[in-house]
Curated annotation (Swiss-Prot):
Sequence positions that bind Zn(2+): H12, H14, H197, D278
Keywords: Hydrolase, Metal-binding, Nucleotide metabolism, Zinc
Positions that bind substrate: H14, D16, G170, D279
Entry EC number(s): 3.5.4.4
Biological processes annotated in GO: adenosine catabolic process; hypoxanthine salvage; inosine biosynthetic process; nucleotide metabolic process; purine ribonucleoside monophosphate biosynthetic process
Sites annotated Important for catalytic activity: H221
InterPro entries for this protein: A/AMP_deam_AS (IPR006650), A_deaminase (IPR028893), A_deaminase_dom (IPR001365), Ado/ade_deaminase (IPR006330), Metal_Hydrolase (IPR032466)
Gene transcribed to yield this protein: add
GO molecular function: 2'-deoxyadenosine deaminase activity; adenosine deaminase activity; zinc ion binding
Pfam families: A_deaminase
Entry protein name: Adenosine deaminase
TM spans (from-to): none
Catalytic center residues: E200 (proton donor)
Length: 333
């Protein structure tokens, strides 16, 4: 179902949600960190979703083992490099990797700005090695509160030229976007793009708030947008992208089944929705699965899947010249 004549993108992909089980095992042994299992086979159920989780917060606990083994900046650098290697193996031409430096630093009190630098270094080295194009999106983990998010923002701003956009992720219900207005004002002043996780656990009002008050140009997940016809019209007319993550939304119980997922409705309404993975290692999926298995199960036609692939580049945080160059590069391959 993937059109090989077009760039393949993944623009909603958490770097800290894509830490290989083998890497968790390796780093756990290297730093003498107690893990819930000592073999790859027995570790996987602890670090990967093997059935549907009851809610988003339960799903997020599966990510914790990955960051618990990040006991050094070199470990962060390794994980970043491996993210690009994984993207190359999946056939991705362009990826936007988002990461929460405070979350990655938390278990071992690493310097947050140092984590940002390590991720930048690892991604750069990976891109040079594997030929994938990548951009970095900094995440503020709302679950840890306004002050912690301010620390993350300061660390990201220390490397502002290497960061493309700012995101807000975590407990959407407990920590609404209205708490973070000043944070996003600073991000926009820095010239960054804005994307926000919204309409995943909360309703359409969360999406409206992200757009109107935080300046969101894209929305992560946004499944609840279908509950508000005026919002759907606004998204289409203003070309505000939706970063859809099919399998993830089932695993978090955000959507009951793939057949119920609103991606098809988004595309029919003219909303610029794209196909993405979210947390590939935790979910046990890759972008190929999303195109070949999840999208057809969600009722998308071949042409709609192709449109979602086109949308991925259309709403990417790249200049028109960069998009054109990527299209030409893929067409010539």
């Amino acid at each position: 179902m993937i059109d090989i004549t077009l760039p393949l993108t993944d623009i909603h992909r958490h770097l800290d949600g894509n830490i290989r089980a083998q890497t968790i095992l390796d780093l756990g042994r290297q730093f003498n960190i107690a893990l819930p299992a000592q073999t790859l086979e027995t570790l996987i159920p602890h670090v990967q979703v093997t059935s549907t989780e009851p809610d988003l917060v339960s799903f997020l606990t599966k990510l914790d083992w990955g960051v618990k083994v990040l006991a050094s900046l070199d470990a962060c650098r390794r994980v970043a490099f491996e993210n690009i290697e994984d993207a190359a193996r999946n056939g991705l031409h362009y990826v936007e990797l988002r990461f929460s430096p405070g979350y990655m630093a938390m278990a071992h009190q690493l310097p947050i700005a140092g984590v940002v630098e390590a991720v930048i270094d690892g991604v750069r080295d990976g891109c040079n090695t594997f030929g994938v194009e990548a951009r970095l999106i900094g995440i503020m983990s709302r679950t840890f509160g306004e002050a912690a998010c301010l620390q993350e923002l300061d660390a990201l701003l220390a490397h502002r030229e290497k960061i493309t956009a700012l995101d807000l992720a975590g407990d959407e219900l407990g920590f609404p976007g209205s708490l973070f207005l000043s944070h996003f004002n600073r991000a926009r002043d820095a010239g960054w793009h804005i994307t926000v996780h919204a309409g995943e656990a909360a309703g359409p009002e969360s999406i409206w708030q992200a757009i109107r008050e935080l300046g969101a140009e894209r929305i992560g997940h946004g499944v609840k947008a279908v509950e508000d016809r005026a919002l759907m019209d606004f998204l289409a007319q203003q070309r505000i992208g939706i970063e859809s993550c099919l399998t993830s939304n089932i695993q978090t119980s955000t959507v009951a089944s793939l057949a119920d997922h609103p991606l098809k409705t988004f595309l029919e309404h003219g909303v610029l929705a794209s196909l993405n993975t979210d947390d590939p290692a935790v979910q046990g999926v890759d972008i190929i699965h999303e195109y070949h298995v999840a999208a057809p199960a969600a009722g998308l036609s071949r042409e709609q899947i192709r449109q979602a692939q086109i949308n991925g580049l259309e709403i990417a945080f790249l200049s028109d010249d960069e998009k054109r160059a990527l299209r030409e590069k893929v067409a010539a391959a």
